[in-house]
Regions:
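Metal-dependent peptidase/peptidase-like ectodomains
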Residues: 175-289, 294, 298
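Alpha-helical metal-binding/catalytic segments enriched in His/Glu/Asp
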Residues: 109, 123, 127-129, 133-182, ...
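Extracellular fibronectin type III
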Residues: 454-481
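Active-site-adjacent mobile loop/cap segments within catalytic or ligand-binding domains
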Residues: 44, 208-229, 275-353
Length: 481
């Protein structure tokens, strides 16, 4: 027996480390239906969470709900040695559904990255609720699914992931004011911009808990991910380039959708992603849109089939049909799967270096040249992806190790100087050189190309497409000569 134990120990020492997907499967195990139910039960207990309801009543209204969410974040932070920074950000708005200036407050927790604290991935859900009349701030509006389910996913993600450390930063956000005009999304997007965050992805969870539609159709095996095609921020400048070079289906948000689709397939949790190629549902909107308007990659995650009898409805029964967004309509097994997908995505994106910024050349040539920046030292390799122009998913990739990229080059930088007796002295700095891959006998016309970054542990970023506006940072128009 002693020899067997010793041999087993030696085998473990020499064993390969778990794959990234194996790590993600282990991370999502603690996601709890019971905890998700507890969160929604508590949210429902506040009666209404309408944006215009009381912000000071300790038991009823939006203020009580925000205070409770803040206390939950605080509790999770205490359990992980104060690993979360719990914060609020507020702005005052007025509009069609805000007849008087109203303070909009988002409550969120920041889990700062150990290596790249400015690279940020955000999960968010709106905590406010409503009934039929969007201005009715007094009637009970349980909002169990819209958007108690998304808020529950945010809090559960914080509970589960705060037990781990990640190179990048994760932000868990509960937003106020969505039903009155996406004001919570605007507030947090403005905060992210003011902080100078490099927002890699925003996962907006809105209505993720019901599995049966108002027509009786049920589907607990799919999640819809909605994403914009051409990026909205910078659209006026990018339109002519996109018309010539393509990219209608390759915004950063669309590549987040592809990333989630592939992740769901690999996790094997009984949930498949159905990519919806729209910014949001037909003639509707969500809190990811203000992020898109500022140039941050964002997508909406939602149920496969909506039930319109259960959202934005007064609590009532008519002709034998029950209306209202009550907790008995939530499918908690389905909500747990949706939450696991989010948790895995957050962990994966926070573990990977941010996507590079690729460019492609190959006009009037039988070969294609793909180049990209190698700005993040955490990237140990890159994958150069391609797919046919009419294909949805990335089809094939070639790996380029960072050691195959050019070494940093010493260059003279007039902007950097050391003061001397005779004035400023120009000094040299190390400048990173672009990586390059030449694809022989691959015609640029027939393919879309992209590049992802891979960490030393094998975690891969979403793919950034080599198209106009394909980079994962806000678009900056070139200076006109």
């Amino acid at each position: 027996m002693r020899n067997f134990v010793a041999l087993s120990a030696l085998a473990l020492i020499g064993a390969a480390p778990p794959s990234p997907d194996a790590k993600l499967r282990a991370i999502i195990v603690p996601v709890s239906q019971a905890q998700l139910r507890h969160t929604i039960e508590t949210l429902v207990s506040f009666g209404t969470r309408h944006t215009l309801s009381s912000q000071t009543d300790p038991k009823r209204g939006i203020g009580a709900a925000l205070n409770w969410a803040e206390s939950e974040f605080g509790r999770y932070s205490a359990a992980c040695g104060n690993c979360l920074t719990v914060a609020r950000t507020s702005e005052t708005f007025s509009g069609d559904r805000l007849p008087t200036p109203t303070k909009i407050t988002d409550v969120f927790a920041i889990q700062r990255g150990t290596e790249r604290p400015n690279d940020v991935v955000i999960i968010q859900g709106h905590i406010d609720s409503r009934v039929t009349d969007p201005m009715n701030a007094t009637s009970d509006a349980p909002g169990a699914n819209d958007d108690g389910s998304g808020t529950a996913a945010v809090l559960e993600a914080a509970r589960v992931l705060s037990k781990h450390k990640f190179p990048g930063t994760i932000v868990y956000a509960t937003l106020m004011g969505e039903e009155q005009g996406l004001y919570g999304g605007k507030t947090l997007a403005n905060y992210a911009k003011a902080q100078g965050w490099n927002v890699v992805a925003v996962l907006n969870n809105d209505i993720i808990g019901n599995s049966c539609g108002s027509d009786g159709v049920c589907d607990s095996t799919h999640a819809r991910v909605l994403s914009e095609g051409p990026r909205s921020q910078g659209e006026a400048d990018l339109a002519a380039q996109t018309h010539s070079l393509g990219g209608e289906n390759d915004s950063p948000s669309r590549n987040i959708s592809r990333f989630l689709d592939g992740l769901a397939d690999r996790l094997k949790i009984g949930l498949d992603v159905r990519q919806i190629w729209r910014t949001d549902r037909f003639s509707r909107g969500g809190d990811h849109i203000p992020f898109l308007q500022l140039g941050f990659p964002a997508a909406r995650i939602s149920v496969a089939v909506e039930n319109y009898n259960w959202q934005h409805q007064d609590l009532r029964t008519e002709k034998g049909i029950r209306y209202g967004d009550t907790i008995d309509h939530v499918d908690f097994a389905y909500l747990a799967k949706m939450t696991k997908l989010n948790v895995a995505a957050l962990a994966s994106i926070a573990s990977a270096p941010p996507p590079p910024e690729p460019k492609v050349e190959g006009a009037v040539s039988t070969d294609t040249t793909v180049t990209w920046n190698q700005g993040d030292a955490a990237a140990r390799s890159y994958k150069v992806w391609r797919r046919r122009t009419d294909a949805n998913r990335w089809e094939m990739a070639q790996t380029v190790r960072r050691t195959e990229c050019p070494e940093p080059k010493q260059v003279m930088d007039p902007a950097a100087y050391a003061p001397g007796k005779d004035g400023s002295v120009t000094v040299s700095v190390l400048a990173l050189q672009a990586c390059k891959l030449v694809l022989r006998h691959i015609r640029v016309d027939d393919w879309v190309f992209g590049v992802s970054s891979v960490s030393k542990d094998g975690f891969e970023s979403p793919v950034a497409s080599a198209v106009p506006g394909g980079a994962f940072h806000p678009y900056i128009a070139p200076e006109k000569k």
